[in-house]
Each structure stands twice: as C-alpha cells, then as structure tokens.
Design a protein with these regions (language model features):
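Active-site metal-binding motif and surrounding structural segment of the metallo-beta-lactamase
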Residues: 88-134
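Short, electropositive alpha-helical surface patch
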Residues: 89-93, 124, 131-135, 189-195, ...
Length: 279
C-alpha cells in the first residue's frame, strides 16, 4: 500500500475511534410568575366535571446549559388586557421572576416556544437578545392564513405575532421542522399533538436524566396519569399519542412536567418562593 493509502487508513481509524461528543447537560427550573384562580378543569382535561376549579400555575422554564447558554421554554405574558379577562394574582414579570437564579433578561440566549398562545408567547419582548425557536408550520400559519377567518386564531395575540415577525426580520428566529434532536446539543424539539396548529414540547438532558417539558401539550399530571387528552386541541388522538411519546422520551415518569399544574411546585426541590429545580 502506498504512502497516501496508509495515511488514509490511519486517519479513518483515528476518526472511527474518536468518542462522540457528549451532549450538553442542563439544569432545569420551573418558575411560577403568576397564578390564574378558579380556572375550569373542563378547559384542561377532556370530559372533566364542569364544576371542578383549580388555581393554575403560570410558568416559564429555565434551562441553564453547561456550555453557558441560558434558554427559556416559553416566555409568559404581561399585556394588560389579560388581567381584565382572567383572575390573575401574584403576578411578577417573567423577566423578574428568573432573577433569583442570577439571570438578567439580556442573558437569555434562546426561547424555545411551545406554541404561540398569548400566555406563552406574550413575554418575548422582555428578552431582547433571545433567539426564538418555533415550529415552522406554527409560524407560517399564525403569521398568515389564520387571520383570514374569525375563528382560526383563538388565543393568539396579534402583538405577539408582530414581535415574532420583527425578530425574524432581525435574523433571530429559527423555524423548527418537525421532530429535531440535533440542532441544539442536549435539547430535543418534538411535535406536540395539535394543541395549536403545530405545537411542540421540549426534551432536555440533565445530570439526572432526560426531562420532558410538556407545556400545554399536557396541562396537568391528571392528563398524563389518566391518559386523557387536553381539552383544547385540534386533534385529541394526536395529543394522546404525543403524551405516549413523552413517556418514551423521559428517563423517569416523574420527569415529565405538565404545563400548568401547581403540584409541580410541591413535587420538586424549592429554590425560592416561586422556583423549583426539576431533578
């Protein structure tokens, strides 16, 4: 074998023997920035008793990466109109709610947006440096055809849409194309089962295993424990399938975190009055 051939064989052998890069590990925190009181459980769990009420947690999730990144899953809300529509109490700005973790708003590098409803997309403007990650189909629908009829953009705030479009014109929106576990080390994006046009949920690698942040694709632990679809979905069967996928992804069942269940803040280690660490 010639010299060039030997060199190629040795180079390939070294490449094959090189260990794969280890995924970035994250610390994950649930941050409660508000409560909505007396919320009907029948709007959360399909078929639930209409008389049931629950004080639901309004939450963003912080992902602190071992590589120095700081990401949020969802951004909360702060527009005044929603304080008139809902019984909001104990509110602080999401950008202030993360302060006990030593994070300033301009240190947030990314927002992984589960969907474009007002209570999840309404705080993007509070984090001026962040790149927004949203499903491509979700973005295209709610920046376009959804506004051609009166009943196809429920829960979507036009000002939130304009903020995301503005950020896109600045080159700071990434359109996620379906399931994606390769774009960001240690983070996976997964189709969420049609809570909105194309909602998504997020999986995160931590030192204790893989955490799944369901957001509104599973509102409460009860959705997950009773295999009940969420009440607000465009496709109940797809939502149940998404919940099954969450179970397969999470390292342990207790590492699937629902979107609005106040019990999250009783089940995990408290860091401050409004924050628990998911582990």
């Amino acid at each position: 074998m010639g010299g060039i051939g030997c060199f190629l064989v040795l180079a390939l052998a070294r490449f094959a023997a090189a260990p794969a890069a280890e995924a970035v590990k994250y610390e994950v925190y649930a941050v409660r920035f508000a409560t909505i009181s007396n919320f009907p459980v029948s709007s959360l769990i399909a078929g639930a008793d209409r008389a049931r009420r629950l004080d639901i947690a309004m939450t963003v999730w912080v992902l602190k990466g071992g590589n120095g990144s700081v990401a949020l899953v969802d951004s909360g809300f702060h527009r005044e109109q929603y304080f008139r529509q809902f019984a909001v109490k104990d509110f602080i700005l999401p950008s202030d709610a993360i302060a006990p973790l030593g994070i300033k708003p301009d240190q947030v590098t990314d927002i992984f947006l589960s969907h474009m409803h007002w209570d999840h997309a309404g705080g993007i403007d509070l984090f001026s440096a962040a790149r927004v990650w949203v499903q491509k189909d979700e973005y295209e629908y709610y920046t376009g055809v959804a506004w051609q009829a009166r009943n196809t953009h429920g829960g979507i705030d036009a000002d939130d849409v304009l903020e995301i479009v503005k950020r896109n014109t600045m080159g700071r929106v990434t359109l996620v194309r379906g399931d994606d576990e390769t774009s960001i080390s240690g983070v996976g994006f997964h189709i969420g089962g049609k809570h909105t046009w194309q909602s998504q949920y997020v999986s995160v690698e931590t030192a204790k295993g893989r955490v799944v942040l369901a957001s509104d694709n599973a509102y409460l632990y009860e959705n997950l424990e009773t295999h009940k679809p969420i009440a607000q979905t465009l496709d109940a069967e797809a939502n149940v399938r998404a919940q099954e996928s969450m179970r397969a992804l999470a390292s342990k069942p207790n590492l699937i975190i629902p979107g609005h269940d106040p019990a999250v803040f009783d089940r995990f280690t408290r860091v401050s009055e409004r924050i628990v660490k998911i582990e």
